[in-house]
């Protein structure tokens, strides 16, 4: 029996199996993340230490735990985040196996490239934030505090929340060109229409940058908006390629 002919309850049973496999993979990755929490915290603190370089009077890079439960909360938060990241390849494979029978032949050929490019873009965005954006953002806040005559002493909860939101936000934002290409490939969105409404797109990108950035200051907003706009232009070029590719496929099918 083909997958499309399965009874509804059988589809629910398959979905239940997919959810259990994904949950097990994330759980195993979370356990590994909790077990290596010391090393993970060192990695997460690296942008903070980089922000201190070159300062005549560097601020203390030690994070504070003001609440009794702060260390446990941060450990679980980082553990789950590490679990999702470590299990992502396996989760994508399981989801792909579940979705594959329901897709047309042409759509099946797009599944692996979309997953691969999406993963690379997310990791690229997170690494861009980690090595370039986070140290500059932290340095900005330290300099601003010093200008106000304040000493920078951050809690581990506030720091990890800020760092993780920035990393995930940049990772998701870097998916923009892929989303634009997919919409063009499916015929939902046209490059010409997007190009004609570029000014509206710029406003939308500013709103997106403001939503993704944990703070509302212009400095961090700019750090998010500039790469977002570059990705938008890249996505616009990708939309043109996708439309040309779709037309070529249509012409070849028409001749046959």
Question: Which positions does each model-derived feature cover?
Answer:
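Membrane topogenic/interface segments and analogous intrinsically disordered interaction regions
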Residues: 1-256
């Amino acid at each position: 029996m083909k997958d499309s002919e399965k009874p509804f309850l059988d589809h629910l049973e398959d979905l239940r199996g997919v959810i259990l496999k994904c949950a097990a993979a994330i759980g195993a990755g979370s356990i590994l993340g909790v077990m290596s929490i010391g090393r993970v915290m060192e990695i997460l603190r690296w942008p903070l230490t980089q922000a201190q370089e070159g300062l005549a009077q560097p601020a203390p890079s030690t994070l504070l735990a003001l609440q009794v439960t702060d260390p446990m909360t941060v450990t679980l938060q980082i553990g789950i985040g590490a679990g999702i990241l470590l299990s992502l390849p396996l989760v994508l494979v399981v989801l792909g196996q579940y979705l594959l029978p329901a897709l047309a032949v042409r759509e099946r050929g797009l599944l692996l490239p979309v997953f691969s490019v999406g993963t690379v873009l997310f990791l690229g965005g997170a690494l861009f934030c980690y090595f370039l954006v986070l140290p500059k953002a932290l340095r900005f806040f330290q300099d601003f505090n010093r200008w106000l005559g304040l000493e920078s002493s951050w809690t581990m909860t506030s720091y990890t929340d800020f760092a993780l939101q920035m990393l995930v936000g940049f990772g998701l934002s870097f998916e923009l060109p892929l989303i634009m290409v997919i919409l063009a490939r499916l015929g939902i969105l046209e490059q010409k229409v997007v190009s004609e409404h570029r000014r509206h797109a710029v406003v939308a990108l500013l709103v997106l940058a403001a939503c993704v950035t944990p703070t509302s200051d212009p400095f961090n907003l700019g750090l998010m908006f500039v790469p977002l706009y570059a990705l938008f232009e890249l996505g616009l070029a990708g939309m043109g390629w996708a439309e040309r590719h779709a037309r070529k496929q249509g012409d070849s099918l028409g001749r046959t």
